[in-house]
Curated annotation (Swiss-Prot):
This protein's record includes keyword Transport: yes
Pfam families membership: MFS_1
GO MF annotation, one: transmembrane transporter activity
Start-end of Basic and acidic residues biased regions: 18-32
Domain of life: Eukaryota
Function summary: MFS transporter; part of the gene cluster that mediates the biosynthesis of the fungal neurotoxin cyclopiazonic acid (CPA), a nanomolar inhibitor of Ca(2+)-ATPase with a unique pentacyclic indole tetramic acid scaffold.
Glycan-linked positions: 48, 90, 252
Region (Disordered): 1-45
Name of this protein: MFS transporter cpaT
Organism in which the protein naturally occurs: Aspergillus oryzae
Transmembrane regions listed in the UniProt entry: 58-78, 93-113, 130-150, 154-174, 180-200, 212-232, 288-308, 325-345, 367-387, 395-415, 427-449, 463-483
Family statement: Belongs to the major facilitator superfamily.
Length: 496
């Protein structure tokens, strides 16, 4: 968000009298003020907020980025109950009850990211969370599977805001050298949420029925509505400057005020530019395209596991529905280990590289943890696949899932931090493009899971996934060593 640049200033355009054109007349135009921040330490600027205010806001955003991904998987252990209740035995349709939510996650960012540039991040968080709550209530009373699919789709659209805008909010509030911990907290939700979801959903649906899964979601999202309405603050600088300009106009109507040339675009033009920006970045910039593909594969694997682990443990290890949810703890523990290792290393490694680079920061300095981290997901898939294929003790596949969880953190955190640093003011658009791709793959790859495992078995099926993941290893290596040259290449300078 330009935190490294000189902050905006208030510039006054003098009247004719001030320019030495003779005495001022009563009909002379009033002076014009261009509104900016009151110096580099202006406390109204989000990057200068108190530590307490920053982390209150960060905590709420992290809660949202935990809650909305949790909703994607919480119904996974209850797929059988849902289909039984609606008298269907279609396994692909059962998987789609889970994954259609991610179709909404793919559609939502295309609209919510540009709307945040017009109305601010806060308004999108508020309206989106309220509508998200409504769709969860609708899911609890769904009369048939078709209606449930529609409600899940719209819940995904309205719930995609926090994941799309969260990285931009981090960039708003934290200087580049301080973002590592905040990005780790933001990035933890999209991984821990889907892991904890099946644990809660398994026992709750077994005890109270699958509809109570949606009532629980409605309750916890209702709490989120209260937080975003009464505690969360706006952090998007252009919107804050527009608000400041309006406030000055009200207090002194004799002074013409604007919030900078870049902020005077009409809403329609801003919306069109912002809605096309993620598409341009996705198709015209190699870093966004390849890292979006990378995260798409990772999320596709995650949701493929979510939709198949339940059946594997019920049929192979004879777990109850509630106990099956506990299997996902393996991914959660792995994710926590990944956070403690890779989250802590992110800022340290970057600071070392900055010092070696004569104090000059580069986005590519976020990528070193991704290189060793790229081996973890293949290790986990081989471990999980062959453990289940050979019917080895049930703890062994869970350990394999732990490797997968750790690898996902090691993959997603550096990529998100890299995109935020590389695109600055347009970080939300880069993350939106990334979210669209990973959500589409996450929605549709699980549909191929049952037929793939039926043909190849759990061992070779998961090995195939592992080999594909290994094939992506050159991506972070290439961008670490040549990323700046690629970014500076005029062929990839996109007008956004």
């Amino acid at each position: 968000m330009g935190h490294q640049e000189e902050p905006p200033r208030i510039c006054k355009t003098p009247s004719g009298h001030e320019q030495g054109e003779g005495p001022a007349e009563k009909t002379s135009k009033p002076s014009t003020e261009e509104v900016g921040w009151d110096g580099p330490t202006d406390p109204a600027r989000p990057v200068n907020w108190s530590r307490k205010k920053k982390w209150w806001n960060m905590g709420i955003i992290s809660y949202l980025t935990f809650l909305t991904p949790l909703t994607s998987s919480i119904v996974a252990p209850a797929q059988g109950l849902v289909m039984k209740d609606f008298h269907s035995t279609n396994r692909t349709l059962a998987s789609f009850v889970v994954s259609i939510y991610l179709v909404g996650f793919a559609v939502g960012p295309l609209f919510l990211a540009p709307l945040s540039e017009i109305y601010g991040r806060l308004r999108v968080y508020q309206v989106g969370t309220f509508i998200f709550t409504i769709w969860n209530i609708a899911g609890a009373v769904a009369p048939n599977v078709g209606a449930l699919l529609v409600f899940r789709l719209f819940a995904g659209i309205s719930g995609s805001g926090p994941v799309t805008l969260g990285a931009g909010s981090v960039a708003d509030m934290f200087a580049r050298q301080e973002r590592g911990v905040a990005m780790s907290l933001y990035g933890l939700g999209p991984l821990l949420g889907p892991v904890i979801g099946p644990i809660a959903g398994g026992y709750l649906s077994q005890a109270q029925g699958w509809r109570w899964v949606f009532w629980l979601l409605a309750i916890v999202s209702g709490v989120a509505v209260i937080l975003v309405l009464f505690v969360l603050s706006e952090s998007y600088e252009p919107v804050l400057l527009r608000q400041k300009a309006k406030r000055i106009r009200r207090e002194n109507s004799s002074v013409e005020v604007n919030a900078g040339q870049a902020l005077k675009l009409d809403s329609r033009k801003v919306f069109i530019q912002a809605i096309t920006r993620p598409t341009k970045l996705l198709f015209l910039t190699p870093n966004v395209a390849l890292f979006s593909l990378y995260t798409g594969v990772v999320f596709g694997y995650l949701y493929l596991l979510f939709t198949t682990v339940t059946e594997v443990y019920e049929t192979t290890y004879h777990f109850s529905q509630g106990a099956t949810g506990l299997v996902y703890i393996g991914i959660g523990v792995g994710a926590l280990i990944g956070i403690s290792c890779f989250g802590a290393l992110s800022d340290k490694i970057q600071n070392i590289l900055i010092a070696r680079n004569n104090g000059q920061a580069e986005p590519e300095f976020r990528l070193p943890p991704l290189i060793p981290g790229s081996f973890l997901i293949p290790i986990g898939l081989f471990w999980y696949g062959w453990s289940t294929q050979m019917h080895i003790h049930w703890i062994m596949p869970i350990i394999g899932l732990g490797w997968v969880g750790c690898g996902m953190i090691a993959t997603l955190l550096p990529i998100q931090a890299y995109l935020v640093d590389a695109f600055g003011e347009y970080a939300a658009s880069a993350i939106a493009a990334n979210t669209v791709v990973r959500s589409i793959v996450g929605a549709f790859l699980p549909l191929a899971g049952p037929s793939m495992y039926a043909t190849l078995g759990l061992g070779w099926g998961n090995s195939l996934l592992g080999f594909v993941a290994l094939g992506l290893l050159p991506v972070p290596v290439v961008f670490y060593f040549y990323g700046k040259k690629i970014r500076m290449n005029s062929r990839y300078q996109v007008s956004v």
